[in-house]
């Protein structure tokens, strides 16, 4: 064996043997996620994003994020009729450390939807596209099932095709009238109270008795041009404040100097 110095050991071993471990969360910031004032719970959670560095602005990575929240959590209500409805909220603007969200859709939970489908009854579904007063184009899915007559001895409660067509037409008319005659805020309140489905069930009783009538899903297909002042009205006190306002953690509106921009951190 040759006797001599080990050059590798004298120089500290191989290159890149040990690197300093950096916690990735040290480069991130927490932001509060705010729901519109049509819901009782304003702060629905927090979200994480990389801190602003150079041309990578944190707010650009926050806009467009979609949050799915149960209606029971939004309304602080343990009623089981609210727990199976999920509302989708999309981040549209960032003010200070607050992510301001707007309505982006609604859906039922999978277990609720599957539990309604049973044998010996007719499923009736209607899909309607309608536009609100303030320019939101929505696709609304409505579902209902025929109900068994208590005085009947039959096991089944199937509806005739002519009755199904009449019920579907009645569903379409009611949804069109409700959506086209309201703005987005009024429509969200109707969806939270489930008033549209109750009107459909009541109106179709003369054609064929129904049960488990629900607005199953709502999709936002098109939105009007983004306006900061309208978004701040949804998150403020409704006083029509201009875009020089910021929503605080309690939902109040705070004025800031005109032309104010948050400072950009150059180093982490």
UniProtKB/Swiss-Prot annotation:
Region Disordered: start-end pairs: 1-21, 238-268
One Pfam family per UniProt: Ribosomal_S3Ae
Location(s), subcellular: Cytoplasm
Domain of life: Eukaryota
InterPro entries: Ribosomal_eS1, Ribosomal_eS1_CS, Ribosomal_eS1_euk
HAMAP family: Ribosomal_eS1_euk
Family note: Belongs to the eukaryotic ribosomal protein eS1 family.
Name of the protein in its database record: Small ribosomal subunit protein eS1
Organism: Drosophila ananassae
């Amino acid at each position: 064996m040759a006797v001599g110095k080990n050059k590798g050991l004298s120089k500290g071993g191989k290159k890149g043997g040990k690197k300093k471990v950096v916690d990735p969360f040290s480069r991130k910031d927490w932001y509060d996620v705010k729901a519109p004032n049509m819901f009782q719970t304003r702060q629905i959670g927090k979200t994480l994003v990389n801190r602003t560095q150079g041309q990578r602005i944190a707010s650009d990575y926050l806009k467009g994020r979609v949050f799915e929240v149960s209606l029971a959590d939004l309304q602080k209500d343990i009623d089981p009729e609210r727990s199976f409805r999920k509302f989708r909220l999309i981040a549209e603007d960032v003010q200070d450390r607050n992510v301001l969200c707007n309505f982006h859709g609604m859906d039922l939970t999978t277990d609720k939807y599957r539990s309604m489908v049973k044998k010996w009854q007719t499923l009736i579904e209607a899909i309607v596209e309608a536009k609100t007063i303030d320019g939101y184009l929505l696709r609304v899915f409505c579902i209902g099932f025929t109900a068994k007559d208590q005085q009947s001895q039959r096991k089944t409660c199937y509806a005739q095709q002519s009755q199904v067509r009449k019920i579907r037409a009645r569903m379409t008319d009611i949804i069109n009238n409700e959506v086209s005659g309201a703005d987005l805020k009024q429509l969200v309140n109707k969806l939270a109270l489930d008033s549209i489905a109750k009107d459909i069930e009541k109106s179709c009783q003369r054609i064929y008795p129904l049960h488990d009538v629900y607005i199953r899903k709502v999709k936002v297909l098109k939105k009007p041009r983004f306006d900061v002042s309208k978004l701040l009205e949804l998150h403020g006190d409704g006083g029509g404040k201009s875009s020089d306002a910021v929503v605080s953690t309690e939902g109040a509106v705070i004025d800031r100097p005109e032309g104010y921009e948050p400072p950009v951190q150059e180093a982490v």
